[in-house]
């Protein structure tokens, strides 16, 4: 069976190094580095993998090259959700089968690349590996919809434009809902309930989500008043970021063990509990 080795550019804390159920986060061996570099050489690319580079190793992946970008996105998304500062960046992907590297792909640098990232306090190797597994399970269950959730959240996290960031974050969160619920009121109320918030906290959360959706709607329709709402939202982007991470984490954990229809029923039930 194939395994994907996604090589990082950022320093992964040693407390997150480990292996569980075929998943691993660890430094590449000398033999693995040579195998990846040889595969690049075979493609006419004299690329070097720095000594000590760490890889996220994902088991049971398909060998189809068209699926590699989705693997990169889901790992970048998984890291972004549990990151406190910085944004994860990756150097290369190697697909290994029976100990041999069969495919490689270089990952270009981004302006948002961060050499150092801090992760949430208390996160362990086991916790990170289980989170990666859950993200991949949700991806298999949701297919294209999970790609929208992950891709748009990553774009939000990397965006240098407040307008683009707000649009991408809102689309990421919209993908959690059924198309019939994508109106401002239901968007804010449904997602606020996903957090388990009650009373004043739920009201405050719903108001913030409503402002997010209103900004997205105004931007999409070219409303001149969008700039005023963006100025209002800009200082609250860190709060929106934390809230979105909480909502999306709940979504991924639920969908890794349930169907999309069960998720819709769960949201509906939460409105009356």
List where the protein language model places each region:
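Glycine- and acidic
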Residues: 153-157, 197-199, 225-230
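Flexible secondary-structure boundary motifs
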Residues: 167-203
């Amino acid at each position: 069976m194939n395994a994907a080795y996604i090589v990082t550019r950022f320093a992964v804390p040693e407390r997150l190094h480990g292996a569980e159920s075929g998943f691993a986060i660890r430094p590449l061996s000398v033999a693995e580095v040579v195998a990846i570099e040889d595969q690049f050489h075979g493609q006419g690319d004299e690329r070097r993998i720095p000594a000590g580079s760490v890889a996220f190793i994902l088991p049971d992946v398909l060998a189809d090259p068209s699926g590699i970008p989705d693997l990169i996105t889901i790992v970048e998304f998984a890291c972004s959700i549990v990151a406190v500062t910085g944004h994860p960046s990756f150097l290369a992907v190697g697909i290994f089968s029976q100990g041999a590297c069969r495919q490689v792909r270089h990952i270009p640098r981004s302006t948002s690349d961060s050499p150092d990232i801090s992760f949430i306090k208390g996160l362990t190797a086991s916790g990170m590996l289980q989170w990666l597994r859950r993200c991949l399970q949700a991806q298999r269950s949701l297919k294209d919809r999970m790609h929208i959730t992950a891709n748009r959240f990553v774009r939000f996290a990397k965006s240098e434009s407040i307008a683009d960031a707000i649009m991408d974050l809102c689309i990421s969160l919209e993908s959690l809902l059924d198309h019939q619920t994508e109106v401002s009121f239901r968007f804010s109320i449904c997602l606020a309930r996903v957090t388990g918030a009650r009373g004043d906290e739920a009201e405050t959360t719903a108001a913030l989500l409503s402002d997010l959706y209103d900004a997205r709607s105004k931007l999409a329709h070219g409303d001149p008043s969008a700039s005023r709402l963006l100025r209002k939202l800009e200082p609250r982007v860190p709060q929106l970021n934390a809230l979105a991470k909480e909502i999306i984490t709940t979504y991924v954990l639920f969908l890794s063990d349930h169907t999309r229809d069960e998720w819709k029923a769960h949201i509906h039930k939460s409105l009356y509990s």
